[in-house]
Each structure stands twice: as C-alpha cells, then as structure tokens.
C-alpha cells in the first residue's frame, strides 16, 4: 500500500566538517551528494505490491530540483546561456582511465611543487573521466592531496583557472559540505569586483549546481549588480533572477530594478523565460506589479498551448502570490489544465489546485481532473502536497464527483505519514481543516491532533496561526460531532486564542463601515443597542455576526450585556422627537389611511440622484422594497408594532438578559466578496462551515449579501431601514 513507498527525498547531513587541510577524512567518510530530486534519475521506487503506481505515474513524477528550474537555459535560440551557466551535456573528449591514474600518481611525486596551472589542468582532466570512475577518484587519497595543495596558493590562480577548478568539482560531484569549499568561497568573494558579469553568474550557477549555500558571495554579487543592472542583456537578466530565486532572497531595491528590466524585455521573452522570472521572484518572496502580471497573463494566455507544465505552474505561483485576478488567463487555464493534469507530477497538480483556491477561483473541470488523478499518485505526495490539496478543495467548498474515493485515499495516506507530519505539524493541521471544511471528520486523526503531545509540538514556537487552526478544529468537532469523546484543547489555550481573535475582530472586522452601518440601523429599528450584539458568536470561525434575538411575537429581546442598564442606553430610550400617543396611533390606524397614503406615495416626484434603482443595485433588488416607496418608511403593521413597543420601555434599568428557549436567534452576517468564490455566489469553505455550525446550534442565518447591501450604503436611511426590516422579519 501507499505507506510502503520509499521517501525518495534526500536529507543532507549537517555533521561538522574537519579543517580544510584534513581533506582525506572528508573524502573517506563522505558519499556523493544525491540530487534533491523527487525520484532520482534511473532509479525506480521499490514498489512492494501491485497496487502501487504504474510506470506512467512514475514517469510523470520524475523531477529534479537541479535540472528542472534550469530548462530555460536550454533554448537553442539563446546560445548566450552557455557562457552563463554550467551544463554537463557539453563535455569534451573524455580522459582515459589510464591517464587519470597517471595524473594521480604524479601528485605524489610533485607534491608541493605543483604549480597553479598544473593543478588546474589536473582537475580539468580528472573531471572528464568516465562517470563510472568518479566515485573511485573521490575516494582516492591522492585526489585528496591534490585538493589540499589546490587551496594553498589560491590567489595565484587566474580567474579562468579558478573557475575551471570549480567546474571540475561540479563534474566530480564533490559533496557540497566539503570543508575546502569555504576557502574557495572566500577567494571568489575577494574577486567579485574584478570579474565579468558572465563569470560571476557562471560561478553562482555552479555553486547552485553543487548544492552549496554561499550567502556571502551572493550578497557581494547583488551589490555588484545594483550598480550595473542597466547593462544586463536579456540572458544575463534571466540568469540573475534564477540565481536570486535559488538563493531565496535579494535586496528589494535590486528586485525593483530587475522588474523594470523584465517589463522592458517582456515582448522578447519566451514562455520558459517568463516561467523562470515568475519562479525567481516567487522563491525570493518578491511580488511583481499588477501591471506586469496582467501583461504576463496576456502573453501566457495567447501561448498556453506551447508553454511547458513546469513554466505554467511557476506563472500560477506568481498569480497566487500577487493575488492578481486575470480572468482571461484563468479561463484559458480551465481549457488547458484538465487535459494536462494526468501527465503532471503531484507537486505540479498540487500547485494548480492551490493557486485556484488562493485566488478563490472555482473551475469544476480543473478540480475534477485533480481529484481524478491524485488517488493514483497519492504514494508520491509529500505531507505538504496532501495538506495543500485537501485545503484547496475544502477552501473552495467543492466536492468532486469521486469525493468519497478522493477523501478516503488521502485520509489513508495521512495515517501512513503520521511520522512525517509530526515534523511538520502545520501541514497536519491544514489537512484536517480541509477535511473539516468538507464535513469529513476522521476522529482518530482529530484526537491525535488535539492530544497534549501534539498540541505542545504545534504551539512550542507560540505560532498564533497554528493555535487558530487547533481552535477551529476543536470548536468544529465539538459542534458537529456530538459523539466525539476524545481530546480537547485546554480551557487556558481556548481562552488565549479567543481573546486574540476578539481583539482582532474589534480592531478590524467590527469597525468596517458596512458592518457599523448595519449595526447602527438595526439598533435604531429595534429600539436600542441592547438588542444587537456585534461580536463573534463562534470565535473559532474567525468572523463576526450581528446577533439578534426575537421572541415568538417577533419582539426583540435584550442580549447585549455591555449596554444593558448603562446611562448611555437609558438616555437613548427616552422619548425624543414626536411623542408616540394613543391619538397618534389612532390616526395611523385610521381606516382612511390607505387612501391618503396611496395618494401621497403612489407616484412620488424624484429629484435627480434620488432614483430608487441605481445602476449599482441589482435588478432583482427592487422586489425586496415597497414599489411605492421613496423617502419614507411604509406604514405597515410591523412598523406600528415597533412604534407601539417604544411606549412600554421600562423606566428602571433592565436586568441581565437570560437565554429563552422560545426565542428566535438570528445571526446577521454582512458578507463581502472575500466570502465567495471569484465572480460567483458560491460560498467559500470557512464561511460555509460557519453557517452550517450556526444552524446546527439553532441560529437562523440572515445574510446581508454584498451585492445587495453595499449598493444600499449610498442610498437613503429609509431605504436601508426598509431593507433590513424585510431581511430580519421575513427570515
């Protein structure tokens, strides 16, 4: 089964190294650095039964972290890349085994009399030995002696000789952790300002190919490039961005300059180079401007049939990072991706699903293709892939046709990888949240996640995000799985997260203009702030509601403890303006009022700017309002009931409200675009989960959807009151 697949990712040893002059031990005990590939070349995973992925799945999963990001360098129309980057495909005539042995013997004879030129020549020739001889050369003590002699007079080498030696090290696959590389890095750092741009980029490329981190060299290189960025030609620009991405960081000022160069050269870039640009900026945590992303989207949309899967995924990563919604690009993706997904690796598939989820863009054909392909590839999925896939479907609130198979397969693989998930608790919690959004509750996994051991592991760095995830998980299982009797979070942790979320809500959500306007008007309509509570009913769902309780007679019940009996509320409840008397009510209830009102309201004259249906209001909205309504509130029985109710307001402070079994509990939600999938009215996962749980707790969810409420914010107070009255009392 899936858990029997080997983990083909290599983990590099971090053991301490000996000094540069004791290289013999380094070579004796160091094995060649294995490529950090998902599946190393010419190596199949040992499948232990017939249920494992077949050959086609294996071929789709072959990925090299060294070679794949460098595909743009192989463009035949850009021969300039040959002088900027290392390539093992352009080997000259091989050195014979006999000649190699002779060279190593010469080292023992010449010893310290070896000149820099001879040493460089020896390394070059040894680097051209047949591949099957490389391991024996690395293990030879005479080769270790040659390495030791090479670092004794580094300053005497020419630039070309020093670069040639580094190139030989790459061919020989010297372990990146070898101690002599520290000495070589120092020497290259010393020479940066005297080397050409091509040589500097080539050296950086070889360090990357070796897998050696050289932060000091890159720091000086970037300083050099900040002064010469305007002189970069197109291949140099792309190669530099690639190097920056692999180094994971660069000065923001330099990235802004390079972005302007990308914009200048955009028409000349091919699709693979565009993918390299997006990946370089993405890996270094630098976004591209919306203007540039829209131009990139236009170009890739036109050529999407020709772009490689790898470059396409990299472009998607940048759209995800910048949150730019390029609808033409996304629609083209929906046409192309379903046919490509079966031939893509699981990482690429994950990034497509994750990008769609991050952009809140639901394309059912794309997500169906993902769901249909992944069950057969699940053995190749890392913990991160499982997490992002489950989160993507959950966040988009989408159930594919094969939902049961999809979720069962991925859940089973989570169980198989529990050991790996303990190293990455954030991925484990992301998996579970994705499942919970989709209303799947693997109780054994949830119990493990809420165990004291795992909670301690997940919160040891005091990461608020993981605490929030645990809180959401705990609150959800408590509401939706009453049969669950397993672990729960401690009261202390729940209180801590609740307070942090409430603090955020008070500072951000509760004070949004559209929320405040709704709260104020509802308070006015119901008779005071004691009837409306602007808070998070379910803190674990991370958003607020306007809570209102009505009795069976649709009269509001005071619930806001913070305002009940306060001086401010008492003053608000005093009669102001027109005194509501029996005479006034009799006049309002007069049998002739309908005729009078009909004459006054039937055809009101509207001033310019007071038209009832503005262009920003949906056409169907007018059905919600009284068609004869202009600037006043329609006199209805409900309104009269509310007016009459104000006469009975108690003179003494109200007592603390108590929960009533016969009350209607309303959760009024002011939604916005971020609660829905892009350009649709399909609710996202977290917000769907919240409504589901509120309803389970007996609340009636009343939504003020943004497509109705936001246009109304510019309308008259009377129109807003009428809309809110209709929403609340017809719910």
Name these PLM-found stretches.
Residues 1-703, 707-731:
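N-terminal alpha-helical scaffolds in RNA gene-expression factors, predominantly in nucleus-encoded
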